[in-house]
From Swiss-Prot:
PANTHER family cross-referenced by the UniProt entry: SOX DOMAIN-CONTAINING PROTEIN DICHAETE-RELATED, SOX TRANSCRIPTION FACTOR
GO MF term (any one): DNA binding
InterPro entries documented for this protein: HMG_box_dom (IPR009071), HMG_box_dom_sf (IPR036910), SRY-related_HMG-box_TF-like (IPR050140)
DNA-binding region: 1-54
UniProt name for this protein: SRY-related protein CH31
Keyword Nucleus listed: yes
Main localization (coarse): nucleus
Localization: Nucleus
A GO term from the CC aspect: nucleus
This protein's UniProt keywords: DNA-binding, Nucleus
Source taxon at top rank: Eukaryota
Keyword DNA-binding on entry: yes
Species assigned in the record: Gallus gallus
Amino acid sequence: MAQENPKMHNSEISKRLGAEWKLLSEAEKRPFIDEAKRLRAMHMKEYPNYKYRP
């Protein structure tokens, strides 16, 4: 979406992607949720002492 609309602000891109995400079924969301869990576990293994500090 960002490549197709290079002048679009990130906030607008986020809104549109959020709206598209809400339209997906649970089955369509599942691969993304599973990948996020896998990456989270990998990150925790590689960086066990990591603490989010905004």
